[in-house]
């Protein structure tokens, strides 16, 4: 949306038919409240342009039209309920200021949308995402809207019940190399990391169902290898099979993987779209946990002045759609994310949210054993450690790499921050060698 275009809209004498209101003048249970960062050139009236944006995302267009009557407006118009300038100039805008920055709140009638994630995105992001400086920061959902969603089928407690692990973070391994053939190579690595002590093995997000590594071949080989490892170690391991594909293949992949024995699914939820994640999570025939991978997320959240905030795109929304585990960036490895944002995303996964179960945060991206105490210090025990190369690159092999991470988790849960000291005191050679990588 070009802010320089002349936009006109009709104002009615009835306040309830206009695209603005006091926060106290609306029923919060009838509206989804979107909070935005917006910036406008100095000469523009922020109160008028924000109302134009509200109309653009509800009843209006760039000119008044006959059908947009007061009655239509009363039922369906979005309303600006807050425009707050930062800093809050009261006397005058300084001459040197060219762009003025605002926090804006717009209330959208949720019945315009229904409990549909595709229409939610079309409404709260939609056309206005083309404004040069506009970023969606948060969405406040009314309880009645959220009643239409089931959320995670397992959640934190359910995944822990499946694995029988209650008192520590879980350990996940991504098979490396990311893309490989034949499937036997991955199955061999899966056996090694499973017997070394990982709780979850996931396909890389880049490997789903290519001709050279079909789900029909891969899943039986992986599950046989994992079953052997579980028998040896006396613990259970989940295998998250990547079912990502276009519709309807993604749903067919999920059905096929489960028929072949898969006990967990992985989907690249932003590549497929939130409705696909939701369809998998709410399918009664799918009785396994679902892991949601973050790829494509950077296109939404990385810009400080446009897009969608990380706490929404990585936090609240995948949880609402039904993810049991959400993969997202950790600030301690190769992924760029501020530590406070990474913590805030985890809060969106775990804090109370009506009837929606908490889900596991899974910080990822270049994680090494030395980072585990930081992860535990910032997130506690209810998260999943995501380790890929940090396990497979261990000089004594993947099983030793997995043991090194388990040792690091044990140390962190005992309050150790100096892993070398802990490893030396307990003669843990796997951890000592991992700390040298």
Swiss-Prot record:
Pfam families: RuBisCO_large, RuBisCO_large_N. Mg(2+) binds at residues 202, 204-205. Its cofactor is Mg(2+). One of its GO terms (molecular function) is magnesium ion binding. GO terms for biological process: carbon fixation. Keywords: Magnesium, Metal-binding. The active site is at residues 176, 293. InterPro entries: RuBisCO (IPR033966), RuBisCO_lsu_C (IPR000685), RuBisCO_lsu_C_sf (IPR036376), RuBisCO_lsu_fd_N (IPR017443), RuBisCO_lsu_N_sf (IPR036422). Binds 1 Mg(2+) ion per subunit. The modification N6-carboxylysine is found at residue 202. It comes from the Archaea. May be involved in sulfur metabolism and oxidative stress response. Does not show RuBisCO activity. Belongs to the RuBisCO large chain family. Type IV subfamily. Homodimer. This is Ribulose bisphosphate carboxylase-like protein. It comes from Archaeoglobus fulgidus (strain ATCC 49558 / DSM 4304 / JCM 9628 / NBRC 100126 / VC-16).
